[in-house]
Design a protein with these regions (language model features):
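Alpha-helical cap/lid subdomain in secreted, periplasmic
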Residues: 63-206
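Serine-esterase "nucleophile elbow" of acetyl-processing enzymes
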Residues: 1-59, 71-75, 164, 192-193
């Protein structure tokens, strides 16, 4: 059976807006995706709260994308790798420039291609942050107006990198908005929409 690695942050993990709990397997997009794939594909969930893509996270290796990704890629063979990560690098503590952000996401793509040269990559662009939700929610200490402004530039960056490295691009801005409850995470309805869209792209990729 072919395997898919879903590598990402809290929105891959299934973080429920504001509450901090986790959506169950039938609600988070990775679980729904497995249901849609049935016995055709095995979905491996690798989402982690607060995980950055390319910035060294003070929380540790598990939360630092480029350091922990090789662990998954060396452990088993994946036919398809979904990279759904990047928004945590915009936290106000880190302040990457847009150029540094582009170089960082490209670093993650190169690691993936080096360790899994035959795998197909689906690059997922995060949805733009919601400023009102950020300001009124529990993540106001991690993100600010500059974080939100930079998130509006991500679609161009991900599109450029997807074209450069022959990755399939899925731009979440076209299918799902973040919840106004915290300005960062997705509602259950959005998780369903994301799973259905990714499944369509998987069928085109296989």
């Amino acid at each position: 059976m072919k395997k898919i690695l879903c590598f990402g942050d809290s929105n891959t993990y299934g973080f429920i807006p504001q509450s901090g709990l986790r959506y169950d397997k039938n609600t988070r997009w990775t679980g729904i995706l497995q249901s849609l794939c049935r016995n055709e594909l095995e979905v491996v969930e690798a989402g982690c709260n607060n995980r950055t893509a390319f910035i060294d996270n003070p929380a540790g290796i598990e939360q630092t994308g480029y350091k922990i990704l090789p662990k998954y890629l060396k452990a088993e063979y994946f036919n398809i790798i979904i990279l759904a990560i990047g928004v945590n690098d915009l936290q106000l503590f880190f302040k990457p420039t847009l150029k540094e952000f582009e170089q960082g996401i490209e670093k993650l793509i190169k690691i993936t291609k080096d360790l899994s040269p035959n795998a197909k990559i689906i690059l997922v662009c995060p949805s733009k942050l919601d400023l009102a939700g950020i300001k009124s929610g529990v993540f106001s200490f991690q993100f600010d107006e500059i974080s939100v402004e930079k998130s509006y530039h991500l679609p161009q960056i991900y599109k450029k990198l997807a074209e450069k490295h022959a990755c399939k691009l899925v731009d979440l801005n076209e299918i799902a908005k973040v919840s106004p409850l915290d300005g960062l995470h997705f509602s259950a309805e959005s998780h369903k929409t994301i799973a259905e869209n990714l499944y369509k792209n998987l069928k085109q990729t296989i």
